[in-house]
Structure formats: structure tokens, C-alpha cells
Amino acid sequence: MNRHLARRPLAGLLAGLVLLLLAATAVASSNSITLNLKGGYRNQQRTACSARHHYTLYHGGGTLKMDGYVSPAPALPDGTWRVKIKIKQCKGGRFVAIWQRHARGNGVLLNGVKIGHFRISYRMRRKGYFFARAYYYGYQPRIRSQDQHFRVTG
């Protein structure tokens, strides 16, 4: 048997696997979630827990309002799907979870496309450096927003 002929099916199989992997990655990356922090009185670059980030500053005792979007909108009735919001604080040189809640979501039209929207509030009782993150577990793999860093001052 000719070795070149035996390698062709293997090369074709490898090329097919690469295309399948790229397609799966593209499908997974088409799902997204965003988280937006509302308000704040100033922005600054700071280092907390050994990492430098952009922080939005808020006064302690106030309420941090957040909202975000899940795209595409979950194929569930409005109010039945939920997004988990987690807040972590810099303590002892690392970020630790201090608060988490679930926000109900509903579909909205944005530029003629249905996407999912959610909103939630957090009472800022502690001073320090924090970040908030949103998760949606209805898609596999689950999707996670970028970290939104903020600082609560006195």
C-alpha cells in the first residue's frame, strides 16, 4: 500500500476535526452577558489584591444599581430565567465573595433583535475595593461577564 494514500484520510480527518472545533467555539462564543454599573462619582486606576484595574468610585451607604444583557435572549418566558450576580471584596490580599443574588430576566428588543435584560441593586455598607460579575447558567458552557471593579469610599 502506498504511504501517501494512507496519509490522505488521516489528513482529511484532522482537517475535519479542526473545522468542528472551530465551529463549536464560534457557537459557544456567540452567547454573551454584560454587566453595567450605574452612577459613580469618579474613575481612577488603583491597585488592589496585587492587580491594577480601573475603578469606579461610589459613596458608602448608597445603592449601586446594575443592569445587563444576555445575548441571545434565553428561550424561556419572561421572568422565569435568572442571572446570578456576585460581588467580591479585596480582603487579605485576595478577592473573596461577600454577596450574591439572582436577578430575574426578561426579553427586550434592541435594534430589532430580542435580547435578555436584567437589573439588580446592591446596598454598599462596606468600604473597600470590589468587583461585580454576572453569570448565566442556561447556556452550555455557562457564560460570565467581565469583572466590573468599583471602590466604596467613606
Predicted regions, residues:
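Short, compositionally biased P/S/T/A/G/V-rich stretches that sit at domain boundaries
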Residues: 28-63, 69-71
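Solvent-exposed serine/threonine-rich low-complexity stretches and specific carbohydrate-binding patches
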Residues: 96-113
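Exposed aromatic-hydrophobic patches
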Residues: 110-123
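Extracellular Ig-like/FN3 beta-sandwich strand-entry sites
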Residues: 61, 78-80, 125-131
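Enriched for extracellular/lumenal, surface-exposed ectodomains of secreted and cell-surface proteins
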Residues: 124-146, 152
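Bacterial N-terminal signal peptides
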Residues: 12-23
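Bacterial N-terminal signal peptides that target proteins for export
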Residues: 2-14
